Amino acid sequence: MTISVQTNASAIIALQNLNKTATDLQGAQSIISTGLLINTAKDNASVWSIAQGQRANVGALSAVQASLNRASSIADVAQTAGASISDLLNQVKQKVVAAQDPSLDTTSRAAYNTDFQSLLRQISDVVNNASFDGANILNGSLAGNISFLANADASSFITLSAQNMSLGSSIITIGSTASILTLTASATVLAEVNASIINVNSALGDMGAQATEIQNHTTFVAKLSDVLNQGIGNLVDADMAKESAQLQALQAQQQLGVQALSIANSAPQIVLQLFK
């Protein structure tokens, strides 16, 4: 081997190797700290681009899940209120049927009418308070359906139908001023009560079916989001056991490289020894 005081080829090579090891070590440390094999576009442009696209879809699905969760809450509140209304209508029917007794005196009939009016007010209170986040599908404030996001590109929607259960509506046909003070009036109201009970129970069935549809779709969206996250992980996640082993190997190489550079740098000293 030629020894020169002008050019130390061995030291240059050792330094190059040490620099490469340092670069590789920095990369390994970055992978371990982030847990990502592909963290930026420079790591692998095509894979990074695909992963970013899927991350965008996952983010959009989070918005879909939020919309569907709101739909479920609105439906749950409406169903709870609807069940209470159904129970109140059963009590209303009891009072109206009792008022059909021709033997009742005026005082007794008035007492039944007072109870009847109280129950109607309770129905109105339930209807008016069946709101979630400003949405009430029972009080007639919504003319049709409420639409909620169903997919990541906002091109598909799932709907929750308004069910107007206000007094005097097409579902509860009993008017707010209805009275059972007379036999004739109570007979008219009884027909309205019977129709209202049927209508409310039918509306509750529709709401239940829609709530189930919303819940099923919410479950699907959550699973889809999980699958996409797993797919992203398959693309960019690092094998931590492998990377840990690689880090240890690079650390050993770095130590050896430092020693090699030290040895190479000491070679020119041999020239000085020749002149002693």
Walk through the language-model features, giving the residues of each.
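Primary detection of the long, small/polar-rich alpha-helical "axial" segments characteristic
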Residues: M1-K276
